[in-house]
A protein has these predicted regions:
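Structured C-terminal cap/extension of enzyme domains
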Residues: 3-171
């Protein structure tokens, strides 16, 4: 998708660059979420799996003396069509959680340029590849009809568009 966007001269804003809070630096295994937090609907063990992947990226994070939030933002910005990044600021539960104001200040001090080499960008992508970990929302071949507001059948014209840009058909 990134290559298709670049080929079409489309700029991208990536959101949730903190990956559900994993890169905010405050989550621990067995993280306790506030009542009503939408992340509780994710598959069991996602926090632990995410944190294990962050640990595998630690040498690159430390090499550049980055916070986890800066690391995730800069990795996203390392991709040519990505021009802006937006984390999700959520006040986590617990006395040891970072105040949301501190997270906003940290985000505001983001370095302007990514320090990563292409080899590091590729290494981070390989470590973080979570293809197939959750059902994607939106248009998909999985849906024959719209049973939920965030899932709907893939229309033929969307498949034609995906094919034209080399995006495949396995959605």
């Amino acid at each position: 998708c990134l290559q298709a966007a670049e080929n079409a001269d489309i700029n991208i804003l990536t959101r949730v660059v903190d990956y559900g809070g994993i890169f905010l630096g405050t989550m621990k295994p067995d993280h306790k979420f506030r009542d009503g937090d939408h992340r509780t609907y994710r598959p069991s063990g996602w926090v632990e799996e995410g944190l294990s992947r962050v640990d595998k990226m630690r040498s690159i994070i430390d090499k550049y003396d980055l916070s986890e939030l800066h690391f995730s933002c800069l990795w996203n910005l390392s991709h040519a069509p990505v021009r802006s990044v937006v984390p999700t600021f959520i006040q986590e539960a617990g006395d040891d959680a970072k105040p949301i104001e501190d997270l906003v200040r940290e985000y505001g001090s983001l370095p302007i340029e990514s320090p990563f080499s292409q080899a590091e960008v590729d290494e981070i992508a390989a470590i973080g590849d979570n293809t197939g970990c959750m059902m994607l929302k939106g248009a998909s071949n999985r849906h024959a009809e719209s049973l939920r507001p965030d899932e709907w059948p893939m229309r033929p014209e969307l498949m034609e568009l995906a094919d034209r840009h080399g995006l495949g058909s396995e959605w």
